[in-house]
């Protein structure tokens, strides 16, 4: 497997994989994995896990706020996620996410004065068009639960959904260039 992957990367010869393309390199790698698994009679997941099997599960991310158009609010970012990256195991990660999600409902109620609505992806509907306000509300819910040092944020910006031909990327009531959107997103991390 490693030899095939290395060969594909060397054939491409570019740091960003633009000659063969990441999709082609990935597809060949997966095909090699599938062929190797089939030759041993193992399901793909068992073959990839190796002789010792899977001993850990990645800590998941949890969608807590949904963007889109809800209740007259146009939140451009698609999803706001909580990542309990310091959870000791999957059970604790789920427990943290559930508590934060429930508390976020209370925080949204305090912010808006109304019961929060559930969005199409089963997170709460974003109560503000401003992503910074949404992140602040999530941070408040995390702090209220005592998990400030155990959680991080993630965003599904879905920038293709924000793009309006000839205008740019719609965010916070105005249109941004791609450079401005990147600078804005970078600013959210600081």
Regions found by a protein language model. Name each.
Residues 38-47, 142-147:
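Active-site phosphate-binding and catalytic loops of NTP-dependent enzymes
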Residues 52-67, 95-106:
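Conserved alpha/beta core surface patches that mediate binding of polyanionic ligands
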Residues 9-18, 22-26, 63-69, 157-161, ...:
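Cofactor-binding beta-sheet edge motifs in enzyme active sites
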Residues 2-6, 43-63, 152-157:
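Beta-strand segments within the central parallel beta-sheet cores of soluble alpha/beta enzyme folds
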Residues 71-190:
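Metal-dependent enolase-superfamily TIM-barrel catalytic cores that perform enediolate-based chemistry
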Residues 1-7, 15-24, 47, 70-74, ...:
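Short, flexible active-site-proximal loops enriched in glycine and acidic residues
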Residues 29, 48, 63-66, 83, ...:
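Short beta-strand segments
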Residues 1-42, 94, 123:
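Metal- or metallocofactor-binding catalytic centers and their adjacent structured scaffolds
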């Amino acid at each position: 497997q490693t030899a095939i992957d290395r060969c594909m990367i060397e054939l491409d010869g570019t740091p960003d994989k633009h000659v063969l393309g990441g999709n082609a390199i990935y597809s060949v790698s997966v095909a090699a994995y599938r062929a190797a698994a089939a030759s041993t009679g193992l399901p793909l997941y068992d073959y990839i896990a190796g002789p010792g099997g899977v001993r850990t599960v990645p800590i998941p991310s949890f969608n807590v706020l949904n963007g889109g158009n809800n209740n007259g609010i146009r939140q451009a970012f698609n999803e706001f996620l909580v990542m309990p990256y310091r959870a000791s195991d999957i059970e604790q990660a789920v427990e943290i996410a559930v508590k934060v999600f429930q508390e976020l409902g209370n925080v949204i109620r305090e912010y808006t004065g109304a019961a929060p609505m559930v969005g199409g992806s089963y997170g709460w509907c974003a109560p503000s068009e401003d992503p910074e306000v949404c992140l602040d509300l999530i941070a408040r819910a995390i702090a209220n639960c005592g998990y400030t040092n155990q959680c991080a944020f993630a965003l599904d910006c879905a920038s293709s959904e924000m793009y309006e031909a000839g205008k740019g990327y719609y965010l916070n009531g105005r249109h941004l260039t791609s450079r401005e959107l990147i600078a804005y997103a970078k600013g959210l991390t600081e």
